């Protein structure tokens, strides 16, 4: 039987390619944001007439430079808006709409689709079983113009997830565990397929986090095999009826099992995503700033656990909370989470990548220690190159904000 990757590529190509083959493929969806969009459109202009293969299959979002922190950012947005209007692109999300990857997951991605976008964390849509892959501006411009582009066919790698999450453990810890086991380049050239033994024990938000951070693992794509959770998500969020296919075991280059009950809250310590430690090993490190959000951990359940921990408390370090989209913010506000966070002393906005890339809305200074729920912690990622960055799940981040030092969230969640 074919793997899920082979199944998707067969539907597109009419044949089953071998790993390492170079193939041209027609995407179901193409995306870009403000930071990459400028370059995408420049390349598109250099190709002659500015046109796209299918306006309905293009998604554009302002997120990295949103709201514009300087004149140059504003100029870039004006340039992109002009092209969006001229091309008649209907799926455009201006300032405040949200982060591209979250928007694609919420509104567009479907199981079995092929999605390309001009950002490395396009993999996020793999949460619903889409083959989602980030590309550079030139390749995305070609895909927009021609309706196709090339990929090197990855080898399939199987991951089985068994058991249920212990208290205080989230999808972020699965991602960090895999980084600790395989390293930052461990899945280079692989399409990772995740089979969840107990689907209801692994919610969609956590799946999105793991898919998102597969970029840090070097994966070409990471896809959760569609199951009952996928079907429920699509029905609830989109009104789409979906019946998960029966997937029989295929031939995999390698495989690995994640035992959820054996995991504990983890962190990636400076300055590498695979410098993995238990939260107990770094507990007590004083922290200047906490960031809860990003395309990695800015979804509703992430905001919910932060609010649960911070309710009735005041933060002892600066804390910035950014739901990943307008929709997440709206729901969090309706459920009272935004009030809880602001009353705790957090600064809250939505729909921006600013702190994650060290661009604005929370840039770290020299020597500062930052705990963030985002996806990268190399030098200079969140600001000054001397800032120390720890990656953690939202529960760890919230407990850390409450104490002003890295803290284990489990006592807060048990209490």
Curated annotation (Swiss-Prot):
Pfam families: Aconitase (PF00330). Binds 1 [4Fe-4S] cluster per subunit. It catalyses: (2R,3S)-3-isopropylmalate = (2S)-2-isopropylmalate. [4Fe-4S] cluster binds at residues 295, 353, 356. Keywords: 4Fe-4S, Amino-acid biosynthesis, Branched-chain amino acid biosynthesis, Iron, Iron-sulfur, Leucine biosynthesis, Lyase, Metal-binding. The keyword Iron applies. One of its GO terms (molecular function) is metal ion binding. SUPFAM superfamilies: Aconitase iron-sulfur domain. InterPro entries: Acnase/IPM_dHydase_lsu_aba_1/3 (IPR015931), Acoase/IPM_deHydtase_lsu_aba (IPR001030), Aconitase_4Fe-4S_BS (IPR018136), Aconitase_4Fe-4S_dom (IPR036008), HAcnase/IPMdehydase_lsu_prok (IPR011826), Homoacnase/IPMdehydase_lsu (IPR006251), IPM_dehydratase_rel_enz (IPR050067). Pathway: Amino-acid biosynthesis; L-leucine biosynthesis; L-leucine from 3-methyl-2-oxobutanoate: step 2/4. One of its GO terms (biological process) is L-leucine biosynthetic process. Its EC number is 4.2.1.33. Its cofactor is [4Fe-4S] cluster. HAMAP family: LeuC_type2. Heterodimer of LeuC and LeuD. Catalyzes the isomerization between 2-isopropylmalate and 3-isopropylmalate, via the formation of 2-isopropylmaleate. Belongs to the aconitase/IPM isomerase family. LeuC type 2 subfamily. NCBIfam families: hacA_fam, IPMI_arch, PRK00402.1. This is 3-isopropylmalate dehydratase large subunit.
